[in-house]
């Protein structure tokens, strides 16, 4: 849902994309939180935020786009190592597709979490997306 207007994001808006070779460093990756074994669980909870670059947002007609992935895993990875592997694999997947869009970034993260990185239990996606109104 668009946070600015409250309208549902349409399929053409979500599939609108840019070729990967047209934009340098299209995505920013940060780990905003890493909870190690909270509440005596045998899982770590890692929150990764993926931000779209200014040039990518300009091409897609987006004012703001943050994708927040809350990941439950039984691994006990170092925070920097997990981020490096996650970032590299997502960019690799997008380079193989050749197009960066909102849907493709979500698909890439899903592929990395459940097919590449072992022991992922669950992933919850929240987003902050605002399209340009004008």
UniProtKB/Swiss-Prot annotation:
It comes from the Viruses. InterPro entries: Gemini_AL3. Increases viral DNA accumulation. Enhances infectivity and symptom expression. Belongs to the geminiviridae replication enhancer protein family. It holds the Pfam family Gemini_AL3. One of its GO terms (biological process) is viral process. Homooligomer. Interacts with the replication-associated protein (REP). Interacts with host proliferating cell nuclear antigen (PCNA). Interacts with host retinoblastoma-related protein 1 (RBR1), and may thereby deregulate the host cell cycle. Oligomerization and interaction with PCNA are necessary for optimal replication enhancement. This is Replication enhancer protein. Keywords: Host-virus interaction.
């Amino acid at each position: 849902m668009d946070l600015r207007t409250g309208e549902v994001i349409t399929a053409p808006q979500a599939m609108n994309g840019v070729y990967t070779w047209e934009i340098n460093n299209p995505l920013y990756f940060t780990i905003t939180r890493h909870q190690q074994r909270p509440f005596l669980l045998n899982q770590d909870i890692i929150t990764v935020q993926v931000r779209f670059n200014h040039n990518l947002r300009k091409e897609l007609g987006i004012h703001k786009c943050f994708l927040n992935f809350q990941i439950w895993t039984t691994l006990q990875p170092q925070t920097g190592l997990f981020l490096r592997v996650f970032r590299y694999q997502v960019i690799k997947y997008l380079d193989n597709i050749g197009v960066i869009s909102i849907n493709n970034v979500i698909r890439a993260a899903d592929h990395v979490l459940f097919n590449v990185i072992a022991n992922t239990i669950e992933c919850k996606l929240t987003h902050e997306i605002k399209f340009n109104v004008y």
